[in-house]
């Protein structure tokens, strides 16, 4: 196993909540891996406030140019940057509309949080990223969704191939940050899940394209949320139920003895 694969394998096994800290630690030891790790490892999203509109937005590689980040609300960089990368007028118009649509989706499904949509031009069409962050008031729990998509033209008129890669970074804690440091005081669950999908959909105008992207994100989030609930949390619940009993051990021992006796009789 080479150093790149070893670093990625290590990060997959560590707590997703601490992935930024762990990534910095690895890069301090192996700085030559910076390009590979920073481009392939999704980190929890950070929040900034647009100085012009007052709206919050999320920071990521998709709105970064150097050390500056572009606000999807004002289309300006912070710190200010001359000749920063911006999209064409049509793609920028789509970006504004998608930000408004995802904000409505955020209020309906998450009852608050921060969302950002960033679009950029490609040769024949465009691509983008839909970002969603929902954290508890104490920041002891959080949900980060990162949806990266591209819209590719086909041989059919007004029909496009949409390819979506979605990542969810989830961490939950049953106690405060002080309690989380003590294993006996809190239960901590963390997960990192990535899925891909593609669909061929008609899009005769901008409104249809916005609806298509919204549909893809909504369906993918629902599918991933159900998977986490049924498989990840379901398996965790089974493990806890097997290792924890609400009745005293002394009360359970007679039942265990009786069960073993029955099993022994059945095996004869």
UniProtKB/Swiss-Prot annotation:
Gene3D superfamilies: 1.20.58.570, F-actin capping protein, beta subunit. This is F-actin-capping protein subunit beta. One of its GO terms (cellular component) is actin body. Keywords: Actin capping, Actin-binding, Cytoplasm, Cytoskeleton, Nucleus. Component of the F-actin capping complex, composed of a heterodimer of an alpha and a beta subunit. F-actin-capping proteins bind in a Ca(2+)-independent manner to the fast growing ends of actin filaments (barbed end) thereby blocking the exchange of subunits at these ends. Unlike other capping proteins (such as gelsolin and severin), these proteins do not sever actin filaments. Competes with formin cdc12 for attachment to the actin filaments barbed ends. Slowly replaces cdc12 on the barbed ends in preparation for filament disassembly during contractile ring constriction. Belongs to the F-actin-capping protein beta subunit family. Pfam families: F_actin_cap_B. It is found in: Cytoplasm, Cytoskeleton, Actin patch; Cytoplasm, Cytoskeleton; Nucleus. One of its GO terms (biological process) is barbed-end actin filament capping. It comes from the Eukaryota. One of its GO terms (molecular function) is actin filament binding. The keyword Nucleus applies. PROSITE patterns: F_ACTIN_CAPPING_BETA (PS00231).
């Amino acid at each position: 196993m080479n150093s790149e694969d070893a670093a990625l394998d290590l990060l997959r096994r560590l707590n997703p909540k601490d992935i930024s800290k762990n990534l910095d630690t690895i890069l301090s030891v192996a700085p030559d891996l910076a390009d590979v790790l920073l481009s392939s490892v999704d980190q929890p999203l950070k929040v900034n406030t647009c100085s012009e509109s007052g709206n919050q937005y999320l920071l990521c590689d998709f709105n970064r140019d150097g050390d500056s980040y572009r606000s999807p609300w004002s289309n300006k960089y912070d710190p200010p940057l001359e000749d920063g990368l911006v999209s064409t007028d049509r793609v920028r118009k789509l970006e504004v509309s998608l930000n408004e649509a995802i904000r409505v989706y955020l209020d309906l499904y998450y009852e608050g949080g921060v969302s950002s949509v960033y679009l950029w031009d490609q040769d024949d069409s465009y691509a983008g990223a839909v970002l969603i962050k929902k954290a508890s008031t104490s920041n002891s729990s959080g949900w980060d969704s990162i949806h990266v998509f591209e819209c590719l033209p086909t041989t059919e008129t007004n029909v496009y191939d949409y390819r979506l890669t979605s990542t969810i970074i989830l961490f939950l804690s049953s106690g405060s940050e002080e309690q989380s440091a003590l294993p006996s005081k809190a239960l901590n669950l963390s997960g990192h899940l990535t899925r891909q999908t593609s669909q061929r959909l008609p899009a005769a105008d901008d409104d249809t394209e916005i609806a298509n992207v919204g549909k893809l994100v909504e369906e993918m989030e629902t599918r991933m949320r159900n998977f986490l609930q049924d498989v990840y949390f379901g398996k965790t619940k089974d493990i806890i139920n097997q290792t924890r009993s609400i009745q005293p051990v002394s009360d359970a021992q007679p039942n265990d003895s009786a069960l073993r006796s029955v099993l022994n009789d059945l095996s004869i």
